[in-house]
Amino acid sequence: CRHGLGYSIFEGEKNGIAATQEVFVPRGDACEIDRLTLENKTAAPRTLDVFSYVEFCLWDAMDDSSNFQRNFSTGEVEVEGSAIYHKTEYRERRDHYAVFWANTPVTSFDTSRDAFCGVYGGPAAPEAVLAGHCSNSMAHGWAPVGAHHFHITLAAGEKKSIIFGLGYIENPQEEKFAAPGIINKT
């Protein structure tokens, strides 16, 4: 890997598939942009299952690690295409939300940590990855996450890229909703 001013690049290769992840945070913006490029270096077509994963905080690190009775009931998400919106407490007392999106249509997704990782599992060996697909879970309460699953076929020598964005957005109080219960995403 290598790091520069505001960016990092990670590279790896296994079984004839090269992967490059380029990560940067634009100056002045509350977001991170990632580009994952996969290249098939073999002479035959290859089919891959690619998963992304972020674990959303609940906006207060001290409460996240101590106020469990509250945390088990507050997680809230909205999914639109390949965008997963983390809107915990947006209706009640927040004017901000987070979004994790991709520029490629998903095969499946998860927004519940228990569904993606497994009830007693973790990011080291997520249940969804072991199963080869997500379950399209919608988090209601504890542990909202953003996980995408892409089923990708690469021809011999072909390269494909997926762009991911993780952002934080604030809306003025009077412009919070586009419709009842639907966050304003403009």
Please place each PLM-identified region on the residue numbering:
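Short acidic/polar mixed-charge low-complexity motifs
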Residues: 15-17, 44, 158
